[in-house]
Amino acid sequence: MTRVINLDGESLTLEDVIAIARQGVACRIDDSAIEAVNASRKIVDDIVSEKRVVYGVTTGFGSLCNVSISPEDTVQLQENLIRTHASGFGDPLPEDAVRAIMLIRINSLVKGYSGIRLSTIEKLLELLNKGVHPYIPEKGSLGASGDLAPLAHMVLPMLGLGKAYYKGELLSGQEALDKAGIDKISLAAKEGLALINGTTVLTAIGALATYDAIQLLKLSDLAGALSLEVHNGITSPFEENLHTIRPQSGQLATARNIRNLLEGSQNTTVATQSRVQDPYTLRCMPQIHGASKDSIAYVKSKVDIEINSVTDNPIICKDGHVISGGNFHGEPMAQSFDFLGIAISEIGNVSERRVERLVNSQLSKLPSFLVKYPGLNSGFMITQYACASLASENKVLAHPASVDSIPSCENQEDFVSMGTTAARKAFEILKNSRRIVATEIMAACQALDLKPENHELGKGTKVAYDLFRKEVNFIEHDKHIEIYDELNKASAVIEDPSFLEAVEQAVELSIQF
């Protein structure tokens, strides 16, 4: 039976977002939402017929809020809004981000506080389910008043305007509709504003980054466990008793993950008089990785709220009361996604340091740069440089966007969130850190193969090693490989959900205790 996710504005989960955005799962408007949507629309129709002054319905926008609009111009006002606000720059957002944007906007609108017609929401839903993906430039949003520019680009194809992708082909908006068998629409009063005024773009990008960060946290524990086995690491820093007296949830979870991954390993040791402690990057994984786990768990809690929230303005209350407020302001998510970027950056930082320990013969007691006949062969020498480059780039990207603001719209919108910049930066940091972690896993597997004694790996690390080696080759000599290709294979392995799923079938991994 084909899976369909119901959208009621209340129960959308991050996992649902991933299913619809990346796996193409269909969705529908839940019957429970229809009455509220229709009631909200009737209130807007009454406002227009009664010539009441309501922002964005019978007035202009932004600093033009005191300019009255006649009833006969309320429809043209909405189309003008979309045409002029579609002012984005840069490369198009990827398909999964666009689908997440469409989904989250629909889920917000079905709560029934935006005064939009049910048929208009259904049109956006039809585009999503039929795979018509608007061309949305990645840059141009201040994160308040919502994501105006990118969301206006989302709306253009609904009107037969703009550009959209359909079955991988970039077409005019009208061509995409025609090929998908979809009729264009005209907007009614309030509808343009309802579609573009909200935190949807920054939330969608940040939600995808948050989901991927959760997976990366588990992969970083795996990478660290493999590195620990290379160094015959001391296991006492992961004993539960140590962490229950400082019961930070992420710290407890990391220690448990490492214990689970290393269960049965013959490549670990205990502290002795000659070797009392391991370096921080190995010994302090629970504290370092755990801090990022706690941060990202907090961010996920904010995402869970935001994807089920109304971020429109004005709000049409069920009793007919209209409130002009600021739910479109992205500050809560801007700060959250800045926090996300910092947390992911630290994962990349510590992983890069472990890569250095693996390739450094003085620290690993293995051949320099993890290759036979170093000198003739350079092995992983420049691979570590590349990781250092990504880690250093992350340190620049981790500077918070939310501490910046530029007044706009004749100083009416005088403090903005820069939340979309924060979300985009967090995703870039995520991609960089994921490459570093993939490199650590690749280097650790290479190091394990170079060790003179081939001891049994841990319960979880053995599964990971075996799967990894099916795709990524041992590097015998420089002349036989192009390491760039192997690095790309390594990244592809860890980005494939089946890799982590297989490890988690063998051992339990979590980000919270």
UniProtKB/Swiss-Prot annotation:
Catalytic activity: L-histidine = trans-urocanate + NH4(+)
EC number: 4.3.1.3
UniProt entry tagged with the keyword Cytoplasm: yes
Family, as annotated: Belongs to the PAL/histidase family.
Residues bearing PTM 2,3-didehydroalanine (Ser): 145
Spans traversing the lipid bilayer: none
Record's subcellular location: Cytoplasm
Site of covalent link 5-imidazolinone (Ala-Gly): 144-146
Pathway: Amino-acid degradation; L-histidine degradation into L-glutamate; N-formimidoyl-L-glutamate from L-histidine: step 1/3
CDD domains: PAL-HAL (cd00332)
Lineage per the UniProt record: Bacteria, Bacillati, Bacillota, Bacilli, Lactobacillales
One of the record's GO molecular function terms: histidine ammonia-lyase activity
Gene Ontology, cellular component aspect: cytoplasm
Principal subcellular localization: cytoplasm
Modification after translation (UniProt): Contains an active site 4-methylidene-imidazol-5-one (MIO), which is formed autocatalytically by cyclization and dehydration of residues Ala-Ser-Gly.
Keyword terms, alphabetized: Cytoplasm, Histidine metabolism, Lyase
HAMAP family in UniProt: His_ammonia_lyase
Example GO biological process: L-histidine catabolic process to glutamate and formate
Protein's name in the database: Histidine ammonia-lyase
InterPro entries the record matches: Aromatic_Lyase (IPR001106), Fumarase/histidase_N (IPR024083), HutH (IPR005921), L-Aspartase-like (IPR008948), Phe/His_NH3-lyase_AS (IPR022313)
PANTHER family with a match to the protein in the record: HISTIDINE AMMONIA-LYASE
Native source organism of the sequence: Streptococcus pyogenes serotype M18 (strain MGAS8232)
Keyword GTP-binding: no
